[in-house]
Amino acid sequence: MTKALDGVRVLDFTHVQSGPTCTQLLAWFGADVIKVERPGSGDITRGQLQDIPKVDSLYFTMLNHNKRSITLDTKNPKGKEVLTALIRTCDVLVENFGPGVLDRMGFTWEKIQEINPRMIVASIKGFGPGPYEDCKVYENVAQCTGGAASTTGFREGLPLVTGAQIGDSGTGLHLALGIVTALYQRHHTGRGQRVTAAMQDGVLNLCRVKLRDQQRLDHGPLKEYSQFGEGIPFGDAVPRAGNDSGGGQPGRILKCKGWEQDPNAYIYVITQAPVWEKICDVIGETGWKTHPDYATPPARLSRLNEIFARIEQWTMTKTKFEAMEILNADDIPCGPILSMKELAEDQSLRATGTIVEVDHPTRGKYLSVGNPIKLSDSPTEVKRSPLLGEHTDEILRDVLGYSDAHVAEIHDSGATAPPRKQAAE
């Protein structure tokens, strides 16, 4: 079966997380992704957070599936020759270097267009044009500058970053969409274009409901926030709201049976208006169905702490899975707090390919996330990440058409590895 992106060749100059997230998604959809790495060391994440000495880390392997690796010293004249040839034959170049790095390598946008007018150049940067565009950005910096940290946490506590990598992986996913869109437009124009995704922009895009709330503040308090019911005045910026729901339907994380020993024995419950009477039945407060202080959503807004405390009295008598089963039977929105251990052992996620087991030649079998996007006519087969430079000769021969003698010349120049030592006669 053909893949959705069969025939698309991607030159992958990315490293760490944001860029590799993007190129891995393209590879999962069938693109031929050629990862360009520094001879001798490669992507820095190969050696970061290693759990097994002298073996590619999970940090690297889980972000670089389905790719081919070529080692290339782009400062070496022969290395630059190879890179130029790759630009000529590839469809997309993806990079997440610091500002200006690609230009200093001698490959400006204008130069790339001269080599291959159909080339799409996709870049991840920390910030878009403006006062901060030259600043270096990592995951937590992006969360802090994109509005996530200021709106995450509890009102009286510090701003918090999330466990989800919305800055790195989130921006990588945005860039992948931009690349596919540019490829589609190229069918009509015949030309490549630049595609840029800034990490600050990506985080802010995912925080759009908080930008919504910022504007709502101009017209009065945010009544679904718990501080409204507590009589605490709002300031001029969206506050941190703990675990209050961001969708306008009040919700909280509540304790379940065993919470004293299990840090994840909790469930999230939403008091959605259409199922309010069913909630009252479940928790044994049938009088609340008609009581003027509880019967309508506006009346309940000032009593959310009391209401959720009562619901929690009920959830504490059930395990999180028991509570979920009972609530789901009445279409009451809820979800257990699942630990990474529980997710890793969830057989339904294995069955759908959301979690996959991958076999690696040096580290053995490990678990990874699979493709979260399922295409009926282009199923994803997750293949292991490449060893450093594993496909160098294959790419030189099969992609660029180099002869054995030309490949040997490239190697001897030191463009792909230190020059070979001559054997003593």
From Swiss-Prot:
Q: Where is the active site?
A: 168
Biological or metabolic pathway of the protein:
Metabolic intermediate degradation; oxalate degradation; CO(2) and formate from oxalate: step 1/2
Q: Which Pfam families match?
A: CoA_transf_3
Catalyzed reactions: formyl-CoA + oxalate = oxalyl-CoA + formate
Kindly list the positions annotated as binding substrate. 247-249
Tell me the domain of life: Bacteria
Which positions are annotated as binding CoA?
A: 17-18, 38, 72-75, 96-98, 104, 136-139
Q: Which GO terms describe its molecular function?
A: formyl-CoA transferase activity
EC code: 2.8.3.16
Is Cell inner membrane one of the keywords UniProt gives this record? no
Top EC class per UniProt?
transferase
Q: Which UniProt keywords apply?
A: Transferase
Biological process, per Gene Ontology: oxalate catabolic process
The protein's assembly and partners:
Homodimer.
Q: Provide the function of this protein.
A: Involved in the catabolism of oxalate and in the adapatation to low pH via the induction of the oxalate-dependent acid tolerance response (ATR). Catalyzes the transfer of the CoA moiety from formyl-CoA to oxalate.
Q: Which HAMAP family match?
A: Formyl_CoA_transfer
What's the family? Belongs to the CoA-transferase III family. Frc subfamily.
What is this protein's record name?
Answer: Formyl-CoA:oxalate CoA-transferase
Q: State the species of origin.
A: Rhodopseudomonas palustris (strain ATCC BAA-98 / CGA009)
